[in-house]
Amino acid sequence: MSKVGSSLYSRLHGIFKESSIATAKSAKPRSQTKSTKFPSKLKASTASVGDGGQSSNDAKDSKNSKLTQKVEKFKRSCESESFRQVHGLYSAFIRRLREAKKFSTIDEVLQYQKKFDDIKSEDFVIRIMLLYGYSGMAEHAHKLFDEMPELNCERTVKSFNALLSAYVNSKKLDEAMKTFKELPEKLGITPDLVTYNTMIKALCRKGSMDDILSIFEELEKNGFEPDLISFNTLLEEFYRRELFVEGDRIWDLMKSKNLSPNIRSYNSRVRGLTRNKKFTDALNLIDVMKTEGISPDVHTYNALITAYRVDNNLEEVMKCYNEMKEKGLTPDTVTYCMLIPLLCKKGDLDRAVEVSEEAIKHKLLSRPNMYKPVVERLMGAGKIDEATQLVKNGKLQSYFRYLPDLSAGKKKTTSSPVSSSAKTTSTPVSSSPDTSSFLLSLSLAADSSSSDSDSSSPDSSSSVSSSPDSSSSVSSSPDSYSSFSSSPDSSSSVSSSLFSSSRENSSSPDYSNSVSSSLDYSGSVSSSSDYSSSVFPSANSSSSSSGLLDD
C-alpha cells in the first residue's frame, strides 16, 4: 500500500502501526457472560395436559394459522398509501418475524411490496433492502438491487450504500468488501462519504487495520474529509479493544480536524473505561462531558450499570437507575434486562416485580431473560396469583416474548444463581394442570424454537443481532446479554427521524427521511452518515403497530 503525504493518513498510519502488536494481543475473543437458554416447554406442557403429541401438533397448527392471519392482515394494511409511509410499522412487523426466524415469511411480505407504485421510488426500495439486511438476508437485498432497472427504479449511490449496509448488518463482511470493490466501476457509481463510512464500520468489525488505512487513503484521494461518524467508528473499535492510548490519539486527531466529540464519542470512551473497571476515570469523564454542554443519555448510564452489574453491585446499579429517572430519562430494554435479573439474583423479589411492572408500563420490547426470572421465582415462592398477573399484564401490552416453564408440580429452579446472602428456598409449584396451561396460554406464542422456524432461508446462517447496528454488539462485549444489546447509542433517537409517523395522513408519499440524511448514533442528523442507523424502532418505542402484532 503506497504512502501518501496526507497528514491524516500519516498520523493514522503511525497510530495503527504502534498499536498493531497490542491489537493482535487484544484480538482474542472477549469472555462473554453466558446467557441461559430457556428452551420452550410448550410441547411438553401441552402433552402432559392434553392428548400427548396431538396437542402439540394442534398448538403448532394454531400458531401457524395465527401467523398466516397476521401476515394477510399486514398485506391488506399495505394497500393504504399512508400506511406504507410509516416506517416503524414495517420495522416492528419484520422484527417480530425475524425473532421468530420466519425468514420465508419475511421474504413473502417484502416481495409483496413490489405490487405498489412506490417500488419505483429508490427510497422505498432502500427501506426494503435495509429490512432484508437486518434480517440477515443480504442476498435477497442484492437480488432486489439487481432488479431495480426492471422495476423502473433508478439506481444511485444511495441504493448502493444500502446494499453495502445490508451485507454489513448481515455480518457478511467479505461480501461487502467484494461488492465495494467491484460494483462501482461496473455500474458507473461514484462512492460518497456514506460509502466509505459504511466500509470503515465493516472493516472495524473485521479488525483489519491495514484495510481501514486503505479506505482512508482512498477517501482522501477522492477529495473527501472524514466526518464525526468516521472517527466515532474508529473510537468505538479502539476503546472496545481497550487500546486507550491509541484511542486517545484518535480523539486528539479528531479534535485537530475541528470536529467536536458528541455523545456517541463520549459514550465509547466511557464504555471502554467501565469495561476496564476504571470507574473514577469514567465518572470524571462524564463530568467533563457535562462541562462541554453534553448531557449523559440512557446509554451513558447503561455503560455504568453494565460494569456495576458485573461486580454484582446492586447499590450502585440502583443509584444509576434512580439518577437516570430523576433526570427525565426513560430506561430502555438494555437497562431492564440488566436490572431485573440482578434484583432476582440478590433476592429482592418485591422490587423485581415493581421494576418489571414499570418496564411493562413503558411498553418496552422485552427479551426472554427480562421477565422470566421474576415469574419463575414468584412461582417457586407459591405466588401463583402474582405470577399470573405479571404475565397477563405483559400479554395485554403484547410485549411478553417468552414461554416460561410453568409445568404443573415441577420444582422450580432459578435461571440465575442466587447469592448465598440472599438465597431463597425454591418450593414445588402446587399449581394445577389448568393453572399451568392457563399461564402458558397467556404467553406470547411467537416462539423462536427451531421446530417452528424457517431453516431454509439462504441467508439465515449468519447471526443477526437484535438491534440493527451491532458495531459494538454483544459478541464483542462481555457485559451484555446476547439477546439484546447492539449499537449502544442507536436506540433513543431513531424514531424521531427515520420512523416519524407524523406523515401517516400525508396526501403523498415521503420516504426522504430514510435516505436523505442518516442518524449519527447520538441522534443528531448528519448529512454524511452511513446507513447503519436502525431501521427498527427504538427499544423504547411504544408503537404496537395498530394492533397488527397483537396476539
Swiss-Prot record:
Keywords: Repeat. PPR repeats lie at residues 121-155, 156-191, 192-226, 227-261, 262-296, 297-331, 332-366. It holds the Pfam family PPR_2. Signal peptide: none annotated. GO terms for molecular function: mRNA binding. It comes from Arabidopsis thaliana (Mouse-ear cress). Residues 29-48 have a biased composition (Polar residues). This is Pentatricopeptide repeat-containing protein At3g13150. The keyword Plastid does not apply. Residues 58-67 have a biased composition (Basic and acidic residues). Residues 415-435 have a biased composition (Low complexity). Residues 22-67, 409-435, 449-551 are annotated as: Disordered. Belongs to the PPR family. P subfamily.
